[in-house]
Design a protein with these regions (language model features):
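C-terminal beta-signal and adjacent terminal beta-strands/loops
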Residues: 204, 209, 500-501, 575, ...
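Flexible loop and strand-edge segments within Gram-negative outer membrane beta-barrel domains
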Residues: 237, 250-295, 303-324, 331-334, ...
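Short acidic/polar hinge/loop motifs at secondary-structure boundaries
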Residues: 104-133
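N-terminal periplasmic "start-of-domain" segments of outer-membrane beta-barrel proteins
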Residues: 27-59, 84, 92
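Gram-negative outer-membrane beta-barrel transporters
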Residues: 364-366, 416-420, 430-431, 557-573, ...
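Periplasmic-side early beta-strands and strand-to-turn transitions of outer-membrane beta-barrels
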Residues: 155, 163-169, 173, 177-277, ...
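Solvent-exposed loop segments that connect transmembrane elements
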Residues: 208-230, 309-345, 383-397, 433-470, ...
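Membrane-embedded beta-barrel scaffold of Gram-negative outer-membrane proteins
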Residues: 294-310, 485, 491-493, 497, ...
Length: 765
């Protein structure tokens, strides 16, 4: 069977969870689903192969990186566990990212704690992507698509019995001497299930495949880095979850408490590093398989405490008493004063409360009606304690009592007629944002009159404090997806949608045009500084896509799939260079240097094509099954108002894999090919990168209760610049835009990691 059949899909939706309707087995039997290399859980979606998920656990500690296997999906470089996913050139908050049904939020001006950073790859059981045109039931407050990640469902024992099992794993990587482990345990009866999962990941700095800089100093006396070492790529992370679930007949109640402790994580493309991130997440869900369909309800709460400062590879002491701006190493000084600064602490606290209720109602035949409501209330405080020198004598309030409240409702009709499947939906959404008054380092009260302060802090604060900051956006989204199974060897799909996203708090309510402060508000990793505009309009994307899928009748020998797409975004949030002195758009653009930009709505267009193919080469009992697979994509993004290119668009890329499966063995050789990134954002002074090719090896052996794998990434230790890695600011005097001989200066992209040998083992008990 090549793909999920319609009756099986309905049965799976109604069963909702393993064993959910055990008391009525005659109506809800076990459903076994098989599919091809990109499993399709529903129309418009692509799912990561569970085997691929398992094979990534020793290779990466970054859940977002697991999605690189899908055509059209890439990742912005960030910290070692915090990459930002991108779908067809739209990334980060332009995507809806759900983790176990929760819309988690990054509480950081650099988005160092994005949603996928709260789940370890070792805890991921399933993951799927809805690119571009998404059904309204899974889309919302996004324009680029939806990513859905789930941990394993609760498990129950047969009636009258108990179940006790678990698994443990460990891995090591030569890159950064990274290592980690994971543990999971379950105890269950027929009605109750108790579970625990935990993981730990740690790494030192990684190295490139060659020297990429001509300096070794870090800004810290006595501490230097080799010219091939990528500064600020270290990390340490611990994630733990405790779960209790109860079922009775067709009803399931599931509660999970998760805790994350991330004591340090370096960021090579950000001027700050994460020095502490703790999060408590409470997730309570109900699922009922009822006579008329499925009812689901969920409430969750996320409480985040986040801290940043200059990490081990970046200058910590600033001010004249530390040696001044021209010193490559800041000397310790005291006392903290107008001439002596100890770091630049930045803190943010975020609270995120969500509620959702949705139902899938059976209609005639296999047709379904999905309806639902969602509420999300988010609160954010972001402030920077005084630390001396220019950060003195009071705290800097970046966002005060930021509020972003979402209210949404949707209806979606899924219709099946012979070889046709159609999903038509409408979604109504209202998003209210607001923030309180602010002040800079130069005063302890929010000013409403006056000027002054270094970097025009008082002037900018007055303009912000006297503005109308209470904004409400109400809009209607729609999507229509049609699939036609023309024959046993041809499938076609067409989709059209209008999707809307309200600006985030850091886009609307950051206020200071001062270069130093703006440098700290950046979640794209380009080394520039950004500040917001309270009058930003929501982004609206009108997208059209089509898919042609040709394959053999059995779906096991060959396939070719092409998906062209086009998106018009009339209110795309891009940026313009800003002159802080005159508080106007820059009359003369800054070229080949870092600069300050302000968010601005502008007309944009994105288009491209995703492609994939596979071919079964031969199958032998003695030699195994050999398969060749090709995936890739091409994307372009243009700012139609300025004729500039959009930032961080992945260039033409393709991955060619030759794999062998024999018994418990899976072996693969992978070629990764990326074209030159020549089309870059001039307003941001984005750096071009050259094309490259890499070779990776993987071997995995799996038995019922244990598995072991080894692999080599970048086999030939090839040097290359990561096209979405951003600007290298991983060491030196990163708080400022320094003059020679100081660093970091504009012109060095973050390089990719050199050769990395890894090994992992997993045991079940």
């Amino acid at each position: 069977m090549r793909s999920l059949t319609i009756p099986a899909a309905v049965a799976l939706a109604l069963s909702a969870a393993p064993g959910l309707a055990a008391d009525d087995a005659s109506e809800l039997e076990e459903v076994i689903v098989t599919a091809n290399r990109l499993l399709a859980p529903g129309i418009g979606a692509e799912q990561l192969d569970p085997n691929h998920i398992r094979r990534q656990r020793a290779r990466t500690s970054d859940t977002a990186r697991m999605f690189d296997a899908l055509p059209g999906v890439s990742t912005y470089g960030a910290g070692g566990v915090s990459s930002l996913p991108s779908i067809r050139g739209l990334a980060d908050e332009r995507l809806r990212t759900q983790v176990d049904g929760m819309d988690l939020v990054a509480a950081c001006p650099n988005h160092m704690n994005p949603p996928l950073s709260y789940i370890s790859p070792t805890a991921v059981a399933s993951a799927e992507v809805y690119p571009g045109v998404t059904p309204v039931s899974v889309g919302g407050d996004s324009i680029g698509g939806t990513i859905v990640v789930r941990s394993a469902d609760p498990r129950f024992a047969a009636a009258g019995e108990t179940l006790a099992d678990g698994e443990a794993g460990a891995y090591f990587r030569s890159a950064g001497s990274g290592w980690g482990g994971n543990l999971a345990a379950t105890y269950a009866t027929g009605d109750w299930s108790f579970g625990y999962t935990g993981s730990y990941a740690s790494s030192d700095n990684t190295r490139a495949g060659g020297d990429f800089k001509d300096y070794t100093f870090t800004g810290r006396p006595g501490h230097s880095l080799p010219r091939d070492e990528i500064g600020s790529t270290y990390y340490e992370s611990t994630n733990q979850s405790a779960r209790i679930a109860w079922r009775s007949g067709a009803h399931l109640v599931d509660f999970t408490y998760s805790y994350q402790d991330l004591p340090e994580e370096g960021f090579p493309n950000q001027r700050m590093d994460l020095t502490g991130n703790t999060a408590s997440i409470y997730n309570l869900a109900y699922t009922g398989a009822l006579d008329w369909g499925t009812l689901k309800a969920r409430t969750y709460y996320q409480d985040v405490s986040h801290e940043m400062d200059f990490g081990a590879d970046k200058r910590y002491w600033y001010g004249m008493a530390s040696g001044g701006m021209m010193s490559v190493d800041g000397s310790p000084c005291s006392p903290i004063s107008a001439t002596c600064a100890a770091g630049m602490p930045m803190k943010s606290d975020g609270e995120n409360l969500g509620i959702s209720v949705d139902a899938a109602i059976r209609l005639a035949g296999d047709d379904l009606l999905r309806v639902g409501v969602e509420v999300q209330d988010y609160r954010l405080n972001d402030w920077w304690p005084a630390s001396g020198s220019g950060m003195w004598p009071y705290d800097f309030v970046n966002i005060n009592d930021g509020q972003r409240d979402r209210y949404a409702g949707f209806g979606e009709w899924e219709v099946h007629a012979d070889r046709w499947t159609s999903i038509l939906g409408l979604r109504v959404e209202s998003v209210a944002t607001d923030a309180g008054r602010v002040h800079g380092y130069d005063t302890d009260v929010p000013p409403t009159t006056g000027t002054g302060g270094s970097g025009n802090q008082t002037r900018d604060a007055v303009l912000f404090n006297t503005s109308n900051r209470d904004q409400v956006d109400t809009y209607v989204d729609a999507s229509w997806i049609v699939r036609y199974e023309a024959s046993d060897t041809q499938d076609y799909q067409f989709g059209v949608a209008q999707k809307t996203r309200t600006p985030g708090l850091y886009e609307r309510y950051t206020w200071s045009s001062w270069q130093m402060a703006a440098f700290m508000n950046n979640f794209v990793g380009d080394g520039n500084g950004y500040f917001g505009d309270v009058n930003l309009d929501p982004e609206v994307a009108r997208t059209v896509s089509a898919t042609a899928d040709w394959h053999d009748a059995a779906g096991t020998r060959w396939s070719v799939r092409l998906t062209p797409y086009w998106s018009d975004v009339p209110d795309y949030i891009d940026a313009i260079q800003w002159d802080s002195a005159s508080n106007t758009p820059a009359a003369t653009p800054v070229v080949d240097n870092f600069t300050v930009l302000r968010y601005r709505n502008q007309q944009a267009t994105l288009y491209g094509i995703d492609f994939s193919a596979d071919l079964a080469l031969f199958d032998s009992a003695s030699w195994g099954r050999y398969v060749a697979q090709l995936t890739g994509s091409y994307a372009r993004g243009k700012n139609e108002d300025t004729d500039d290119d959009l930032y961080n668009i992945m260039p033409l890329n393709a991955t060619l894999t030759l794999s062998q499966d024999l018994g418990g063995w899976h072996n693969a050789i992978v070629g990764e090919f990326v074209g030159a990134k020549d089309d870059v954002s001039k307003v941001r002074n984005e750096m071009q990168t050259a094309g490259y090719g890499l070779v990776h090896l993987l071997s995995r052996y799996e038995r019922d209760w244990w598995s072991v794998e080894v692999g080599i990434d970048n086999l030939f230790d090839r040097f290359y610049d990561a096209p979405l890695g951003g600007a290298y600011v991983g060491q030196g005097s990163t708080m400022m835009n320094p003059m020679p001989p100081n660093e970091p200066r504009w012109g060095t992209p973050v390089p990719g990691t050199g050769r990395s040998i890894y090994a992992g083992v997993n045991l079940k008990f």
